[in-house]
Curated annotation (Swiss-Prot):
Family stated for the protein in its record: Belongs to the ExbB/TolQ family.
GO annotation, biological process: protein import
Principal subcellular localization: membrane
Organism: Helicobacter pylori (strain J99 / ATCC 700824) (Campylobacter pylori J99)
Topology in the lipid bilayer: Multi-pass membrane protein
Keyword Cell membrane: yes
This protein's name: Putative biopolymer transport protein ExbB-like 1
Transmembrane segments: 14-34, 99-119, 147-167
Short name of one Pfam family: MotA_ExbB
Protein origin, superkingdom: Bacteria
GO CC annotation terms, alphabetical: plasma membrane
Length: 189
């Protein structure tokens, strides 16, 4: 198997090799962003669920966040709506970082793969024209080799898009818990 991979890269053009390396980097980035954000969002979600539970039970007055250290009006025992909104926006901004990488990868990887395929097919037709051979037995292996770049692009895009949707849902869940805390703290008198 390793020999066939080496043979493929030896027979491929520069652009196809570049495209496959690029798509491989995309795949590594996809896995890294997904694993990292999954862990971070799981921790944040657990923290905000606990914070909401503590606020509802009266165990704490505000979320465990540096923005709430001594920012409460002690006379009314309330936090300003502006502070609550700023906290909410900060949590959402932090939780969505990295998602744009998955979005870009899922939308561009197929086109990068297609570009590699088109260039490889153009090179193949150029070589076929120079040789004067145009039989199916000659064309089929060249086109199948060229289509590997498109397949690789699609292969990189599918997990990127799937992981994007999974993480987007986790961010939504986090935003619901944050909004519930904002609503509760805004309604306290």
């Amino acid at each position: 198997m390793f020999d066939s991979i080496v043979y493929f890269f030896n027979k491929s053009g520069f652009v196809t090799t570049l495209v496959l390396v690029w798509i491989s980097l995309y795949l590594v980035m996809t896995l890294w962003v997904f694993l990292y954000k999954s862990i971070v969002l799981k921790i944040e979600l657990r923290r905000e669920m606990q914070s909401l539970s503590n606020i509802l039970n009266g165990a704490q007055d505000a979320p465990e966040h540096f923005m709430f250290n001594k920012k409460r009006n002690d006379e009314t025992k309330r936090y300003s709506n502006e502070l609550l909104q700023a906290w909410k926006h900060q949590v959402l901004k932090q939780s969505t970082t990295g998602l744009v990488v998955l979005s870009i990868i899922s939308s561009t990887a197929p086109f990068i793969g297609l570009f590699g395929t088109v260039v490889e097919i153009l090179e193949a037709f150029n070589n076929l024209g120079a040789l004067g051979q145009a039989s199916f037995g000659v064309i089929a292996p060249i086109i199948s080799k060229a289509l590997i770049a498109t397949a690789a692009g699609i292969l990189a895009a599918i997990p990127a898009y799937s992981f994007y949707l999974i993480l987007k849902r986790k961010v939504y869940d986090l935003s619901v818990y944050v909004q519930m805390q904002v609503d509760i703290l805004s309604s306290k008198k």
